[in-house]
Amino acid sequence: MNTPLQDAERSRAGEPPASGAAPLIPDGLDAVIVLVRHGQTEFIVQGRFQGQMETPLTPRGERQISRAGLRLAHPHDDPPLPIPETAPFIIAHSPLERTRRSAELLVEAFAAAGRATPPLRPEPGLKEIAQGDWEGLTDTEISARFGDSLGAWRRWPELTYAPGGESLEEVLRRVESTLTKLLTELADGARPGTMDRHQVLGYADHSAEPKRWALLVGHGGVFRVVVCALLGLSLDHFWNFDFGLAAVSVIEIRAGRAVIRGLNFDAGEEGRIETDDTGRDAKGAL
């Protein structure tokens, strides 16, 4: 294994660090990935684990997503979002009903704002983590039937998972496959980026130009894995990230390096940050 000093020598020679695995992000890619979690659902209101069970958006959930769509259609309105003014080249979404409907509402919001409407594409790799025998149950019911397995999942998610469900390693494999495809598409025809520029916000970037970007509509659990994959973090960081209902999160790719620009940008009720968190952090939200 190379030492950091050896990797630094390779970097000075214009060579990438010698690591065992091929990098997920294409070298030199400049792009933006925007994550939008689905809106409130019936199961979230009831405090039930969703996993891959179908559960519809509530009327409030549809309103949440429609507001997020208008925000994305006017990204540079005050306060601005750190995303390009151009439309995304694709809206890739989990094929589950709650995310499919959320993606449709985002497209409707783009159209209502007179913006170009990006194509929709279902991506099975963005499905929520399968929670097996826990799906449809409340945490109280899970604890009564399965003892401390839920507590173990919340403490060591990289080591434990629901009976009949998916391990995070299994989820990571499908997430990486989906991201590899999307990142390759983003790199198609994109201008190669460079790290030879300011990496601290606030400085003018005179080389900046509109970047290609992709909009992903998914779930809180799978998005945690997406962020770990893009940042090169191990899965024991799973619970370090959280995603609000219908909130917008932005990851910028700078010359092949993922940088979090913001998590949980949220227009909220009538353009304000929501103060009523009913359903946002319900234990059945995963």
Predicted regions, residues:
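Phosphate-coordination/substrate-recognition cap region in phosphate-metabolizing enzymes
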Residues: N2-P23, D27-G28, R67-L150
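Short, conserved phosphate/pyrophosphate- and ester-handling motifs at nucleotide-, phospho-/glycolipid
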Residues: H38, G61, H219
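Loop-to-helix element that buttresses phosphate recognition and phosphoryl-transfer chemistry
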Residues: E42-L106, Y161-T178
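Active-site-adjacent alpha-helix immediately C-terminal to a catalytic or transition-state-stabilizing loop
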Residues: R100, S177-R257
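Acidic, His/Gly-rich catalytic cores of divalent-metal-dependent hydrolytic chemistry
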Residues: R261-L286
